Amino acid sequence: MQTGEYNDAIAILLMRTVTGILFFFQGYDKLFNVKIANVVRTFSEPLSKFRISPSFLKPSIALSSVIELVCGILLFIGLGKNISLYFLAIDLIFVAFIFSSMKAMWDMQYFFPRLLLIVILLFCLPEQDLFSLDNLLNFSIKVGQ
């Protein structure tokens, strides 16, 4: 294996684990530290102008938080990378709508880095992600055949 291939694999590992950690703690904080009710309270006022009721907002934020928590863990360990990235991309669309109701979209300093990490990881080929459970399981399936 060439040095460049290891560098690619390590770069993907770094991006995948950092992205996983970011989303994991984002979901964890909303679920266990800040609590969903407080997050709903924060967004209820700005979203009231769109006539979005808290009864819709609460399960939406809870689902978003669970997606961030679970997909963050999966990205961190490298299991189900693509499906996790798809769920997180959909989650970011929801987050973009919620946050853009509060302030201008271009002022969302935390949104765009996460979006960029997801897009870059989606461009990475699975066979380049050497240090992941997906790769390990795929290798063991191929060896067993």
Model feature map: region roles:
Residues 1-38, 52-66, 70, 77-145:
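Extended, low-polarity transmembrane helix blocks
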Residues 44-47:
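Juxtamembrane inter-helical linkers in multi-pass membrane proteins
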